[in-house]
């Protein structure tokens, strides 16, 4: 699929407060993600490299024990197996890109 309208694409709940419209290629998972205000993404890690980009809202992001307030236009690169988590200070829209593909997310669709 070459063209996608994420405004109308079905979203799946990754876990409470985190809702994503996802696409998967052979090597990448792309997520257009909404987080409800106050949502806590607990500290976790995974084998995937991850890019997170803030489209709108405010997110307190923790990476390797360091906290940073991310605002629109800001983002983070999360290396493989790096402990990270977040708190949605406000409702947020973010872009998440993972490699390799998040097979576990495919199973949620």
Give residue ranges: language-model regions.
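Conserved short histidine dyad/triad with adjacent acidic residue
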Residues: 31-45
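Short, conserved beta-strand element in jelly-roll/cupin
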Residues: 35, 46-61
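A cytosolic small-molecule/anion-sensing beta-strand core signal
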Residues: 55-56, 71-72, 90
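Short acidic-glycine-tyrosine-enriched beta hairpin
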Residues: 66-80
